[in-house]
């Protein structure tokens, strides 16, 4: 019993925290005097840590010093970096008299552009774009030219066996050339064409330029545009299938523009024409030396001019109509 009584007395003697809180609240509710203008600190409960108050205390800014900026911090603009003293860019050197002279290193004050504006590759080589589309156009023109040459060679190979059976007619000389001599002449002409390759290089460049212009014009018709930029963009970025389709159209168009091969003439018809030409040439050569048959008509001969038949021979007496006196005068003279 004694121990229980002592425990109860000890509990009554200790002040309860609830009672203290009530007293603190009552004291906080009392009206403030007009003289207390300073901020009142909040009462802290022992054993309890308020993290919100700690964060707010950390966030509170330090009191500004007199050297702080009046209207906030200055920006990093080149004007402020130039007109605000900076020890990194401002130094002092001595002049001839030994006095310090202020020197400003403003190379780093202004912003510099290290990378060119726009596409760096186009700025490094401005002709890159033009050379690229010209190369594509040249490749397209060469493919079309190769196709046309192959088609011409195939057509010639088909025609040559039929023509080489008979003789060839030369329009320059107007004569027939045998097949053997024609083949030899063709071989010599092919060898001569292969040898002067350096002379034909200039002509080939002109031909290639003409082909490129022709293909450029045909492309404008195929793509249905008059804009050179659109054609350049198509040459650079068009897919392979689309280019193949355009190549087929270009090949057919160029094949139609090329002159068609001559139709071969049959051998019999050619010989008849040659005979007619030769006859007409012979008549033209004979006309100056001999008169035509219409002009050959002469008046009938007189009896004195007609030849006399003596046996099987015909004898013509010359000057038979002259008098004997005239004959004697001629003899004396």
Curated annotation (Swiss-Prot):
Key words of the record: Cytoplasm, Developmental protein, Differentiation, Spermatogenesis
Biased composition (Basic and acidic residues): 324-333
Renumbered residue ranges of the record's region Disordered: 1-42, 284-333
Pfam families (alphabetical): SPATIAL (PF15256)
Annotated disulfide bonds: none
Biological-process GO terms, alphabetical: cell differentiation; spermatogenesis
Single GO cellular component term: cytosol
Residue runs in coiled coils: none
Cellular localization per UniProt: Cytoplasm, Cytosol
TM stretches of this protein: none
Record-linked InterPro entries: TBATA-like
Stated family: Belongs to the TBATA family.
Function according to Swiss-Prot or TrEMBL: May play a role in spermatid differentiation. Modulates thymic stromal cell proliferation and thymus function.
Name this protein carries in UniProt: Protein TBATA
Upper lineage: Eukaryota, Metazoa, Chordata, Craniata, Vertebrata
Gene: TBATA
């Amino acid at each position: 019993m004694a121990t229980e009584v002592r425990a109860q007395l000890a509990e009554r003697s200790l002040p309860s925290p609830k009672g203290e809180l009530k007293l603190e609240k009552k004291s906080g509710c009392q009206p403030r005097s007009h003289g207390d203008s300073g901020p009142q600190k909040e009462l802290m409960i022992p054993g309890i840590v308020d993290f919100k108050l700690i964060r707010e205390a950390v966030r509170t800014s330090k009191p500004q010093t007199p050297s702080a900026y009046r209207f906030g911090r200055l920006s990093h603009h080149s004007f402020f970096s130039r007109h605000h003293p900076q020890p990194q860019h401002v130094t002092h050197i001595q002049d001839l008299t030994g006095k310090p002279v202020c020197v400003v290193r403003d190379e780093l004050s202004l912003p510099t552009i290290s990378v060119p504006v726009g596409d760096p590759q186009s700025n490094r080589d401005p002709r890159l774009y033009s050379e690229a589309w010209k190369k594509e156009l040249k490749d397209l023109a060469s493919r079309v030219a190769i196709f046309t040459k192959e088609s011409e060679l195939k057509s010639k190979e088909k025609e040559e066996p039929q023509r080489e059976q008979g003789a060839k007619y030369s329009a320059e000389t107007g004569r027939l050339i045998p097949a053997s001599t024609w083949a030899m002449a063709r071989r010599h002409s092919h060898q001569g064409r292969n040898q002067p390759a350096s002379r034909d290089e200039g002509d080939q460049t002109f031909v290639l330029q003409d082909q490129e212009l022709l293909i450029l014009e045909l492309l404008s018709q195929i793509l249905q545009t008059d804009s050179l930029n659109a054609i350049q963009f198509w040459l650079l970025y068009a897919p392979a299938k689309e280019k193949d389709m355009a190549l087929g159209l270009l090949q057919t168009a160029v094949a139609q523009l090329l002159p068609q091969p001559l139709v071969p003439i049959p051998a019999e018809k050619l010989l008849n024409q040659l005979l007619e030409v030769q006859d007409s040439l012979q008549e033209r050569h004979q006309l100056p030396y001999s008169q035509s048959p219409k002009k050959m008509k002469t008046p009938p001969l007189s009896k004195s001019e007609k030849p006399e038949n003596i046996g099987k021979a015909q004898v013509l007496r010359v000057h038979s109509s002259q008098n004997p006196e005239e004959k004697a005068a001629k003899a004396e003279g």
